[in-house]
Amino acid sequence: MSVKILKILVCGLFFWSLNAHLWGKQDNSFLGVAERAYKIGNYSKAASYFKKACNDGVSEGCTQLGIIYENGQGTRIDYKKALEYYKTACQADDREGCFGLGGLYDEGLGTAQNYQEAIDAYAKACVLKHPESCYNLGIIYDRKIKGNADQAVTYYQKSCNFDMAKGCYVLGVAYEKGFLEVKQSNHKAVIYYLKACRLDDGQACRALGSLFENGDAELDEDFEVAFDYLQKACALNNSSGCASLGSMYMLGRYVKKDPQKAFNYFKQACDMGSAVSCSRMGFMYSQGDAVPKDLRKALDNYERGCDMGDEVGCFALAGMYYNMKDKENAIMIYDKGCKLGMKQACENLTKLRGY
């Protein structure tokens, strides 16, 4: 046999072995086929193979069928079928199945709302170390079944122990405000906020910033630390964090006054739904502060702030309409500002109406 032919045979054998190895690595079980189909959006094929897996006793297949029917992926939404498959999965100790089952009982989807059934399903998932199920138990005991504050704290704590940021954040709020029958302690609040912030919860970072800024952390005021936490909160799309940074730069509080940076932070916050930040942008446009003076943009931003419930924005907007001789709109918006609790808006409303 020539060397050339031998090389061809060796190469062929190598590639055959490689393909066989790769094929062997690929999961060709019903569940494996279903998962690959699901990833590429072929939901009908995925459902078919998840069902085969479920019928073979693979609990994850049952859970995935529940998800498909709950969300209407490749089929119409069918909460009753979702409930059936989640129940089967949960009976087989599948924590995601128990979580899904708890959610349907919690919301009353595909069945009558039943908090006890929801508690049972979530509790099983929580024991199986499913963080969100622990958190949802906290929510039920906190907000839906009154008189169970101690249970709420227990389950929020479990979710926090499993690194669920919002569980840690809620405990931080509880200790800061003295909610859920815990003894008020800013020191404990900081501990929980710190963990939640490290887990990238923007609300917790903002809360830390406020505590350090105001010296309420049972520590000395530390503006640099406060600023750092507010920056992180803003980077995590927390509108209050961005708004606080905007105020710092606008007033030159703890930082060098910088109207342009203030405007940029207010814009970020406004775009994320901070009513007061929209109103502050309106003021900056009305004064030509860091941006060219533009009364049209001032009016638009005051309107955004007012629409989102900022009484100062409503007051300023009404004043602009009054100056434009539009008494009807001025009255309507002063009325809104008055209802939002601004005394001066109420006084101006009385003057314009004459009563």
Language-model features: where?
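N-terminal leader/linker segments that initiate helical-solenoid repeat arrays
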Residues: 20-44, 48-49
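Terminal, low-structured helical/coil segments at or just beyond the last alpha-helical repeat
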Residues: 27, 336-355
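Hydrophobic face of amphipathic alpha-helices that form TPR/SEL1-like repeat modules
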Residues: 30-37, 64-71, 100-107, 136-143, ...
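Short helix-capping/linker turns of helical repeat alpha-solenoids
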Residues: 37-38, 42, 55-58, 71-73, ...
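Structural motif corresponding to the intra-repeat A-B loop/turn of tetratricopeptide repeats
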Residues: 40, 76, 112, 144-146, ...
